[in-house]
Amino acid sequence: MLRISVMSESEKAIQLRVEGWLVGAWVDELRLQTQAACSQAKTLSLDLEKLWFVDSHGAALLRDLARQNVAQLNCSPFIDQQLKETTL
């Protein structure tokens, strides 16, 4: 299960909280949410404090978002290591 919620939003920025497991179909849901935020020309950041696990597709999405300058905040050491080790 994955929960995505808006933590804060202004004219220029939006911060989403991502909680749970970023796996399977939930990866596409996060992709849709981040695309919607980016399409509004807002700076996007993700609070990953309560993200417990990512599969290889979730890790790939988070790496792609990082390359697009999406800030990833409060990432646990476990998730950080998964992002470094996981390959498709």
What does each model-found stretch correspond to?
Residues M1-L88:
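STAS-like cytosolic regulatory interaction modules
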